[in-house]
């Protein structure tokens, strides 16, 4: 992996990992009480665990592959690494991830190369962050015994992971109706909602369908705009502004997330409220992010890695986990710029969430 010039290494500092309990400002604390569930659709074990407990002093090679550099996915990687460090100290083993980390920068050819290199490096496990990463890594380990543990796969069934015995992980499945209810609660009588997403992002497919169904049921008109690059997303955002929408919904879409810092000011200037499927959007300027605690998601992912490597489990023994979606994150700077009463906004949101957190605009969680 060390000779892959095309692969961008992390720009964030590992020093932040030890502070994961406070790293997401107020956000991480807000999500700490969220619970997880295992999927009833997960694969049942077809074989007994083949391994045994790890020996003290043992070193495991852990490949970690990030799909693209943005706040939510970076936060997951930091959390996975921090948790693996803690588990390693507890169990007296070493998880070597530093030599086997890569960021594909949303490039499929990069993902393919990373997968091939990790297999050639004979890593013990691959942690795949985001749906495209997980799908590519699963293909890469075919005909090997290298397990894949994914994180932030919104719809594992739609991604084709059901029935696959060599993959498991954690899902950030989105409660779209809850987000749509937030929009309506903040804008009584709203008659048009914009949808901004990337058609090529599998994670957006079901959420967009759910949003359309909600709008149809409630007599709300939908205006859809799409983009696959930051430049296209900027044009799509401008088109939504021109269409006169008052609120825009975006699911857990990596393409839009990567572009959020480039579009949020245009939305603010036009008085458009952006409601999204992850806290990182709010961090990058959107009015509202809704969803899981990505620190907790990363920690649970690392726990699954430990169960595979240290406890002799197989992916088939570990059904994928989903987490309660109930955390609303409000960008207070954006709310003020839009002329919204923060106290009134929180009161309107209360019936549809478990926690309300606040952030101000930044590139990454500090």
Predicted features and spans:
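Extracytoplasmic "Venus flytrap"
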Residues: 61-87, 98-109, 200-204, 253-258
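Bacterial lipoprotein signal-peptidase II cleavage site
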Residues: 27-41
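N-terminal secretory signal peptides
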Residues: 1-11, 15-30
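An alpha-beta-alpha
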Residues: 62, 80, 169-218, 314, ...
């Amino acid at each position: 992996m060390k000779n892959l010039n095309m692969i961008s290494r992390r720009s964030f500092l590992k020093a932040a990992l030890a502070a994961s309990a406070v790293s997401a400002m107020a956000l991480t604390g807000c999500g700490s009480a969220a619970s997880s569930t295992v999927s009833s659709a997960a694969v049942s074990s077809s074989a007994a665990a083949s391994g045994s407990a790890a020996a003290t002093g043992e070193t495991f090679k852990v490949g970690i592959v990030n799909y693209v550099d943005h706040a939510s996915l970076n936060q997951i990687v930091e959390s996975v690494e921090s948790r693996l460090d803690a588990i390693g100290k507890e169990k007296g083993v070493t998880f070597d991830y530093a030599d086997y980390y890569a960021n594909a920068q949303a490039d499929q050819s990069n993902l393919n190369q990373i997968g091939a290199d990790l297999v050639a490096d004979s890593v013990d496990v691959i942690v795949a962050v985001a749906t495209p990463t997980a799908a590519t890594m699963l293909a890469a380990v075919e005909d090997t015994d290298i397990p894949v543990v994914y994180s932030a796969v919104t719809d594992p069934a739609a991604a084709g992971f059901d029935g696959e015995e060599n993959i498991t992980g954690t899902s950030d499945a989105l409660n779209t109706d809850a987000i749509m209810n937030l929009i309506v609660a903040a804008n009584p009588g709203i008659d048009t909602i914009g949808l901004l997403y990337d058609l090529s992002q599998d994670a957006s497919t079901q959420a967009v369908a759910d949003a359309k169904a909600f709008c149809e049921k409630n007599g709300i008109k939908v205006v859809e705009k799409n983009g696959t690059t930051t430049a296209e997303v900027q044009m799509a955002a401008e088109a939504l502004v021109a269409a006169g929408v008052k609120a825009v919904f975006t699911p857990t879409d990596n393409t839009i997330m990567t572009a959020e810092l480039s579009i949020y000011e245009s939305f603010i200037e036009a008085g458009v409220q952006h409601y999204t499927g992850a806290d990182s959007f709010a961090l990058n300027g959107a009015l509202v992010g809704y969803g899981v605690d990505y620190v907790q998601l990363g920690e649970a992912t690392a726990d699954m890695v430990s169960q595979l490597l240290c406890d002799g489990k197989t992916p088939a023994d570990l059904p994928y986990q989903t987490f309660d979606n109930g955390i609303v994150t409000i960008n207070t700077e954006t709310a003020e710029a839009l002329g919204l009463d923060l106290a009134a906004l929180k009161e309107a949101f209360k019936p549809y969430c478990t926690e309300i957190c606040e952030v101000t605009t930044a590139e990454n969680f500090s």
